[in-house]
């Protein structure tokens, strides 16, 4: 950086030195030749008058007021340099029962500025398995999550899991006690049946309100859930208990937000709003809800508002194996 600045400074010094020599030579000649003096003054006055004249442009018609905000057209071309992934449940394709539905959706997105080669429609079997290995590989990722009251899956916890990066380590509760050290430190449990019980311990490793040798005295935090983000009192050791054959639990640290991921809840009585959750950073705007209709109507709505959704997101700025976030050790 410094070598470039020195080079520019040297060029400027040489330029001004040469300009001074030329000016001195011209003044010397003008002093000896009145005709040359008159010619130089005439050219100077002619050029100066053009510099201060009003420039109306050439062949540029002016209509209406010039005090108009000009929109930034570069935003309209975002699809030309970005990839878009839309993740949908298997039941969507089953209900639409149309072999050409993907082609139809991509053609509709083309009208919104997204080339067909930049759009990927990815199917997942169920939310629990998808959240376990999400494969969020596009510049922009939109997840359609259908609400099901019969599913033992908390949509707000699913949103928190997918909208943030996590660094996790496996927990061996048969050998060790565990404690959470900060607000961003959580335990994430996944499986077909996660019933988590804990017993808080004092400094002598004796149970607080429970017996470490009697699981029935443990405090039950979750019951038969498929996904649970568990928050206990920071700085206190806990002895945990769960059924290893139907559930896994990991000690995780919540990292930065995945700003290139958005979740759309399809149906359900409430809108996903994890900003109300004290466990997460507030003001998350990348989660919303669409009233449940037919899946064709859902996709039409997504296509119609695709660029509005994208504006609430940020393009992926670095290479990251997002699918491995839950299994990193």
From Swiss-Prot:
Give residues annotated as binding Ca(2+) 2.
180, 231-232, 234, 304
Name the domain of life this protein comes from: Viruses
Q: Which residues are glycosylated?
A: 72, 150, 241, 321
Gene Ontology terms, cellular component aspect?
Answer: host cell endoplasmic reticulum lumen; T=13 icosahedral viral capsid; viral outer capsid
Recount the PTM note: N-glycosylated.
What are the protein's GO molecular function terms?
Answer: metal ion binding
Point out the signal peptide segment.
1-53
Instruction: Give me the segments passing through the membrane.
Output: none
For this protein, the record's Pfam families field holds:
VP7
* Ranges for region CNP motif: 168-170
- Function of this protein? Calcium-binding protein that interacts with rotavirus cell receptors once the initial attachment by VP4 has been achieved. Rotavirus attachment and entry into the host cell probably involves multiple sequential contacts between the outer capsid proteins VP4 and VP7, and the cell receptors. Following entry into the host cell, low intracellular or intravesicular Ca(2+) concentration probably causes the calcium-stabilized VP7 trimers to dissociate from the virion. This step is probably necessary for the membrane-disrupting entry step and the release of VP4, which is locked onto the virion by VP7.
Miscellaneous comment as given in the Swiss-Prot or TrEMBL entry: Some rotavirus strains are neuraminidase-sensitive and require sialic acid to attach to the cell surface. Some rotavirus strains are integrin-dependent. Some rotavirus strains depend on ganglioside for their entry into the host cell. Hsp70 also seems to be involved in the entry of some strains.
- HAMAP family linked to this entry: Rota_VP7, Rota_VP7_A
**What name has this protein been given in UniProt?**
Outer capsid glycoprotein VP7
Q: Which organism is it from?
A: Rotavirus A (strain RVA/Turkey/Ireland/Ty-1/1978/G7P[17]) (RV-A)
């Amino acid at each position: 950086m410094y070598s470039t600045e020195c080079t520019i400074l040297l060029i400027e010094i040489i330029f001004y030195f040469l300009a001074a020599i030329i000016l001195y030579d011209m003044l010397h000649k003008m002093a000896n030749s009145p005709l040359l003096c008159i010619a130089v003054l005439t050219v100077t006055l002619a050029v100066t008058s053009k510099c201060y004249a009003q420039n109306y442009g050439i062949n540029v018609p002016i209509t209406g007021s010039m005090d108009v905000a000009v929109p930034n057209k570069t935003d309209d071309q975002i699809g030309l340099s970005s990839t878009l992934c839309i993740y949908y449940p298997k039941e969507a394709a089953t209900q639409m029962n149309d072999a050409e539905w993907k082609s139809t959706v991509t053609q509709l997105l083309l009208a919104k500025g997204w080339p067909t080669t930049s759009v990927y429609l990815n199917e997942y079997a169920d939310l629990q398995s998808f959240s376990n290995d999400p494969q969020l590989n596009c510049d922009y990722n939109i997840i359609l999550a259908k609400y099901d009251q019969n599913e033992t899956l908390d949509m707000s916890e699913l949103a928190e899991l997918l909208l943030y990066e996590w660094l996790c380590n496996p927990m061996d509760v048969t050998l060790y006690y565990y404690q959470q050290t900060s607000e961003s430190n959580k335990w994430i449990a996944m499986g077909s049946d996660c019933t988590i019980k804990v017993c808080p311990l004092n400094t002598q490793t004796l149970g607080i309100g429970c017996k470490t040798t009697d699981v029935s005295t443990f405090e039950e935090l979750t019951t038969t859930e498929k996904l649970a983000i568990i928050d206990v009192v920071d700085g206190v050791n806990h002895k945990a208990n769960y059924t290893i054959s139907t559930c896994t639990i990991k000690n995780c640290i919540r990292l930065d937000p995945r700003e290139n991921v958005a979740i759309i809840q399809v149906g359900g009585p409430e809108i996903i709003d994890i900003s109300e959750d004290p466990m997460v950073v507030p003001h998350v705007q990348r989660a919303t809800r669409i009233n449940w209709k037919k899946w064709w109507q859902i996709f039409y709505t997504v296509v119609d508002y695709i660029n509005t959704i994208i504006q609430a997101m940020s393009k992926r700025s670095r290479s990251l194996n997002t699918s491995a976030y839950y299994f990193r050790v």
